[in-house]
Regions:
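C-terminal TM-helix exit segments that contain a strictly Trp-centered aromatic cap at the helix terminus
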Residues: 1, 57-65, 132-141
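Interfacial helix-loop-helix junctions of multi-pass membrane proteins
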Residues: 1-18, 67-75
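Structural motif corresponding to the C-terminal cap of alpha-helices
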Residues: 3, 32, 36-39, 180-183
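Glycine-centered flexibility sites
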Residues: 8-9, 61, 68, 137, ...
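Contiguous transmembrane helix-bundle modules in multi-pass membrane proteins
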Residues: 15-22, 51-53, 71-219
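Phosphate/diphosphate-binding loops
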Residues: 29-30, 35-58, 89-96
């Protein structure tokens, strides 16, 4: 089954474009956890693993484009490079696990969830969850061959139903994060509640004026 890009929209979850999105999501997660490492001296192993995964996912994107394992209007090349890239990606994963566990554990334990570092870690996990969902969805034509002779792909509706809510949750967490202290609690509670009230009021006003798309209202 060929999953093709719809040229009438700005994003239609084409497999090759999905492959380029995955490294971006992982590297974005790494940037946020690196902030925790710089400010709080924590998550050293996590950051090593995320930086390694960013590089590996970039080569995996090359594998999708050049191997032809998943059909796309953006893919090119034949399958001759598939095996070397597969070996490289699997070898890179093994090296990444070794490198992550070779880093000595140091620093204090993470603060509670309702803290700046807690929210940044949640953002990291959500970004990684998005990466896994998009990876599985992109490779679904190959995975489906385990139980059916004909490959079956997932259309854009699947990604929109699953990824858009997670993306909105990430946006909400990042909106609240600057108002939190590193050790927990609000930095300036009166201003936070004032800003939250203004946000809810403006969102309600736009909603009644006819702007009904949740992502646009959240932005």
């Amino acid at each position: 089954m060929a999953l093709e890009l719809g040229w009438g929209g700005y994003w239609a979850w084409d497999p090759v474009e999905n492959a380029s999105l995955i490294p971006w999501l992982i590297s974005t997660a790494a940037l946020h956890t690196l902030i925790v490492q710089e400010r709080r001296n924590k998550l050293h192993r996590v950051n090593v693993a995320l930086m390694c995964l960013t590089t590996i996912s970039a080569f995996f994107a090359t594998y999708l484009v050049r191997s032809g394992v998943v059909q796309s209007v953006h893919a090119f090349g034949d399958g001759s490079v598939g095996t070397p890239l597969t070996v490289f990606v699997l070898g890179g994963l093994l090296i990444s696990f070794w490198a992550a566990f070779a880093v000595p554990a140091r620093g204090r334990e993470l603060a509670g969830i309702v803290s700046r570092e807690g929210f940044l870690v949640m953002v990291c996990w959500l970004l990684l969850a998005l990466s896994v969902i998009i990876l599985v969805g992109t490779m679904w034509p190959v995975i489906s061959l385990l139980w059916t002779p004909e490959p079956h792909g997932l259309d854009a509706n699947f990604y929109n139903r699953v990824c858009v809510p997670l993306g909105m949750l990430i946006m909400l967490l990042l909106m609240v994060c600057p108002w939190l202290r590193w050790d927990g609690g609000l930095r300036d509670a009166p201003r936070f509640w004032l800003a939250l009230g203004a946000f809810v009021a403006s969102g309600a006003a736009f909603f009644f004026l006819g702007y009904r798309q949740p992502v646009a209202l959240l932005a």
